[in-house]
Amino acid sequence: HTHVPTADTRILSNGTAYQTDIGMCGDYDSVIGMNKENSIMKFLKNKDAKQHFPALGEATISGIIVEADDSTGLSLKVERFISGGILKN
């Protein structure tokens, strides 16, 4: 899987808000949010890392906002959001 948000946000026919992949929250200039140099060296040297270090670049946060009917719990409205980092809207 890619950790990249998909653009298929919608409400399904029975009222469920849906998006295939919300995306990764964190620094996209990284290895799934971890320091890329450490992760690459671990892969190349086949070393078991005792500790992972988070990437310290600008983070991206992405997700969806769902408005639901209080009585049924069904989705009335759904919209994507992306803030910060390299995937800015």
Say what each PLM segment does.
Residues 1-2, 82:
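Residues that line or immediately flank small-molecule/substrate-binding pockets and catalytic motifs
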Residues 2-54:
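Conserved beta-sheet core of the metallophosphoesterase superfamily
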Residues 38-89:
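A short C-terminal boundary segment appended to hydrolase-like catalytic domains
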